[in-house]
Swiss-Prot record:
Similarity comment: family membership: Belongs to the UPF0250 family.
One Pfam short name: DUF493
GO cellular component: cytosol
Annotated InterPro entries: UPF0250_YbeD-like, YbeD-like_sf
Species whose genome carries this gene: Yersinia pestis
Domain of life: Bacteria
S-S bonds: none
Protein name: UPF0250 protein YPO2600/y1174/YP_1113
Length: 87
C-alpha cells in the first residue's frame, strides 16, 4: 500500500522544492516567479552548480497551506523550459 504525500504532511508546514535545471541566469528568477504566484512571500533560494557547471540546483522553501498548492507547484515548476527535474 502506497502512502500519499497528503497523509505525511500536516498543513500549514514548511516544504522545500529542489529544482534542477540548465545553468542559465534566468532559472532562479523563473522559479521564484512561479512560487510567488502560489505562495507569496520573501524568498532567498539557495543555488548550487553541478560539478561541470552545466546545471544548477535551486532549493526554495515555502509555507505550504494545502496539498493542492504543493502539487500545483510541482507541476508548474516542472513545466518551466529550463527545468529538468523537481524534487
Amino acid at each position: 500500500m502506497k502512502t500519499k504525500l497528503n497523509e505525511l504532511l500536516e498543513f500549514p508546514c514548511s516544504f522545500t522544492y529542489k529544482v534542477m535545471g540548465i545553468a542559465e541566469p534566468q532559472l532562479v528568477d523563473q522559479v521564484v516567479e512561479v512560487v510567488q504566484r502560489h505562495a507569496p512571500g520573501e524568498y532567498t533560494p539557495q543555488v548550487k552548480p553541478s560539478s561541470k557547471g552545466n546545471y544548477h540546483s535551486v532549493s526554495i522553501t515555502i509555507t505550504a497551506t494545502h496539498i493542492d498548492q504543493v502539487e500545483t507547484l510541482y507541476e508548474e515548476l516542472g513545466n518551466l523550459e529550463l527545468v529538468k527535474m523537481v524534487l
